[in-house]
UniProtKB/Swiss-Prot annotation:
Annotated binding of ATP, by residue: 31-38
Protein name: Adenylyl-sulfate kinase
Keyword set, alphabetical order: ATP-binding, Kinase, Nucleotide-binding, Phosphoprotein, Transferase
The gene coding this protein: cysC
InterPro entries: APS_kinase, P-loop_NTPase
EC number of the protein: 2.7.1.25
GO biological processes: hydrogen sulfide biosynthetic process; sulfate assimilation
Pathway(s) per entry: Sulfur metabolism; hydrogen sulfide biosynthesis; sulfite from sulfate: step 2/3
Family, as annotated: Belongs to the APS kinase family.
Substrates-to-products reaction catalysed: adenosine 5'-phosphosulfate + ATP = 3'-phosphoadenylyl sulfate + ADP + H(+)
NCBIfam families attached to this UniProt entry: apsK, PRK03846.1
Residues the record marks as active site: 105
Length: 205
């Protein structure tokens, strides 16, 4: 690896961001299966996209159709799954995009490892803190039923622990309030930290 050097391109992140008129950032949505991560991230992306932002949503299920299709669900494979996603997200942020990632990402160590790849201002952890009882009641994929019956092992929240963030930038319980209000809270936060500038904020009003 000592002979492999990072090549500096003539167009850098700042130039790409300026062209797009936005501040690139990664929003990392973490929480139990069924918490509403993908729904919330998707609704936020739609709002941002319609306001003229350049966005991309990385979803836990979708990446396993290609980027991570060779991985299973062992602890080692799940770690590698998130490592790959973190690297892809880093490239996308470098391209000047607003990136949203929706992954259970159950351990603090995994999430902190991804956070460490970004400047402080470019990583926003969103804890989707919907209680286990609500997630299990929703069970959109029937996974909790299978986990309770023993058909699925090492299932986060049932037979494998979920370590809630200690200091997430935002915490949203999707069992409280409606989706529009939850998206509004995200937009207000992004506006406050200047990810959304004043001109584009008007389009999101």
């Amino acid at each position: 690896m000592t002979n492999i050097l990072w090549h500096q391109h003539p167009v850098d992140q700042a130039a790409r961001a300026e062209q797009k008129g936005q501040n690139p950032v990664l929003l990392w949505f973490t929480g139990l299966s069924g918490a509403g991560k993908s729904t919330l991230a998707g609704a936020l992306e739609r709002a941002l996209f319609e306001a003229g932002f350049h966005t991309y949503l990385l979803d836990g299920d979708n990446v396993r159709h290609g980027l991570c299709k060779d991985l299973g669900f062992t602890v080692e494979d799940r770690d590698e799954n998130l490592r790959r996603v973190g690297e892809v997200a880093k490239l996308m942020v470098d391209a000047g995009l607003v990136v949203l990632s929706a992954f259970i990402s159950p351990t603090r160590e995994e999430r902190d490892s991804i956070r460490a790849r970004f400047p402080t201002s470019q990583f926003i952890e969103v804890h989707v803190s919907t209680p286990l009882s609500v997630c299990e009641q929703r069970d959109p994929k029937g996974l909790y039923v299978k986990a309770r019956s023993g058909e699925i092992s090492n299932f986060t929240g049932i037979s494998s622990p979920y370590e809630a963030p200690l200091a997430a930038e935002l915490t949203i319980d999707t069992s409280k309030g409606d989706l529009a209000t939850q998206v509004r809270a995200l937009i207000d936060y992004l506006t406050a930290i200047n990810v959304i500038n004043a001109d584009k904020a008007k389009a999101l009003a």
